[in-house]
Amino acid sequence: MSYQGKKNIPRITSDRLLIKGGRIVNDDQSFYADIYMEDGLIKQIGDNLIVPGGVKTIEANGKMVIPGGIDVHTHFQMPYKGMTTVDDFFQGTKAALAGGTTMIIDHVVPEPESSLTEAYEKWREWADGKSCCDYALHVDITHWNDSVKQEVQNLIKDKGVNSFMVYMAYKDLYQVSNTELYEIFTCLGELGAIAQVHAENGDIIAQEQTRMLEMGITGPEGHVLSRPEELEAEAVFRAITIASQTNCPLYVTKVMSKSAADLISQARKKGNVVFGEPITASLGIDGTHYWSKNWAKAAAFVTSPPLSPDPTTPDYINSLLASGDLQLSGSAHCTFSTAQKAIGKDNFTAIPEGTNGVEERMSVIWDKAVATGKMDENQFVAVTSTNAAKIFNLYPRKGRISVGSDSDLVIWDPDAVKIVSAKNHQSAAEYNIFEGMELRGAPLVVICQGKIMLEDGNLHVTQGAGRFIPCSPFSDYVYKRIKARRKMADLHAVPRGMYDGPVFDLTTTPKGGTPAGSARGSPTRPNPPVRNLHQSGFSLSGTQVDEGVRSASKRIVAPPGGRSNITSLS
């Protein structure tokens, strides 16, 4: 049962659990074995296990047993312009568990010019009191100066944060400059953290938004029209370039378009340390809904970068996720009510951005990628759990079924079929962007911290039972290549003697003035004579005074063998 609203609920006490007859699926192998769990950890894996009494046995009946999902991108209980998203940490993590996700990583979004540490502590207080599953935190850098740099160092050293997001969009609010990007990436690379980017060209978006409003386009379609995918792609390319120059690992959040996905794929093939995170929405649906006649429906899809209006985009992004060109998945779950979205009913730039997806994420990927033959079950585990654990330095505690790992497990039924509906989803949002979609693949049993959270379609969650899981810096999965490159890229000056030859005398020219004679033209070529325009023989009609007179500066070149009768150069 749910304990929402009750105070001082004790944390979950772990049960002794035995899963029998399941097929264990990790990212690198699948095999049949039983699993014994105690005190929130996996204690034994194998056949004919000897276990103590008082064990609850779960018959898997040959079904897949996979590591619990890790959703790397959520926005629960996020403040926005005096409002708060409708899914707080209780409702949001409850929805996560219903979909097979046993850990989330939420974004701390400090107000511009405010303290990152204070915002972090606020998020910790909210999540500790309400989260039903384990969680970690990213911290967004919404401004940059020496004080923020010191806070970043402290958050990494003392607070268990190893990832920070910067915004290349939201001009005059969160957007940072290229110089600041360079400084932030340099700082994070030295500290062993992961640089995340929201990649869009904010300057051009601001211009396009103004243009759309001047044209009278005020509805949700204006959102996607003012943010074409080229602006996402340009920012991705720029971020990859700056990250490469600073030797900092780059993580692109919310990959929404073919162009952005292709750039990440190409950069990885060239050896760049870059990771791409598509979200439930970009994997499961397209942006044609922005043109819906129903304003509330169209507004429900507003998120940034926007969903692509190209209906072939989800299939394309799933293919890149299946092939490993994109590495992991999040939901970017950020839900507002229709009334909250309606503050932008007359101006699309004021519509609060965000879509649902934490509950649907794993089923969407199974249906769109595994059931269609693009992806095997092991890659499914990789992109929904294991790769996230490796990138954020949680592996093998999370993201793997092995002795000593946390007992966060899901018995997955590949044959289950469910129809998505806002009437029965766990989110508090009135609208579900996947409404009516039939999805193959669903969790039968969800175990978190060794406790059964979902069984027989019923949730058994406890508010505040989730633990904060600290993420340490210098993840091997991310930084082994970075460290090797630092050794190879050790720069040294070339030893040479002092130059003692002549030095050209460069006279400084006042700004806007005429350059001095010594600075005009090429130093290796004499300056040509200057014609006095007031004495020119040029006329608007008729022959010119100097017509037929060959200029001393004109070179006449004859072809080899002399002039031909075909071409006259005289």
UniProtKB/Swiss-Prot annotation:
GO biological process, any: actin filament bundle assembly
Highest taxon, organism lineage: Eukaryota
Cytoplasm recorded as keyword: yes
Annotated Polar residues bias: 533-544
Compartments, as annotated in UniProt: Cytoplasm; Cell projection, Growth cone
Modified residues (Phosphoserine): S259, S518, S522, S536, S539, S541
GO cellular component: cell body; cytosol; exocytic vesicle; extracellular space; filamentous actin; growth cone; lamellipodium; synapse
Residues carrying Phosphotyrosine: Y431, Y499
GO molecular function: chondroitin sulfate binding; filamin binding; hydrolase activity, acting on carbon-nitrogen (but not peptide) bonds, in cyclic amides; identical protein binding; phosphoprotein binding; SH3 domain binding
Alphabetized UniProt keyword annotations: Cell projection, Cytoplasm, Phosphoprotein
Pfam families: Amidohydro_1
Expression across tissues: Mainly expressed in heart and skeletal muscle. Also strongly expressed in fetal brain and spinal cord.
Region of interest called Disordered, as start-end residue ranges on this chain: 506-570
Post-translational modification: Phosphorylation on Ser-522 by DYRK2 promotes subsequent phosphorylation on Thr-509, Thr-514 and Ser-518 by GSK3.
Modified residues (Phosphothreonine): T509, T514, T543
The protein's assembly and partners: Homotetramer, and heterotetramer with CRMP1, DPYSL2, DPYSL4 or DPYSL5. Interacts with synaptic vesicle protein 2 and SH3A domain of intersectin. Interacts with FLNA.
Family from the record: Belongs to the metallo-dependent hydrolases superfamily. Hydantoinase/dihydropyrimidinase family.
Protein purpose: Necessary for signaling by class 3 semaphorins and subsequent remodeling of the cytoskeleton. Plays a role in axon guidance, neuronal growth cone collapse and cell migration.
Stored NCBIfam families: D-hydantoinase
Designated name of the protein: Dihydropyrimidinase-related protein 3
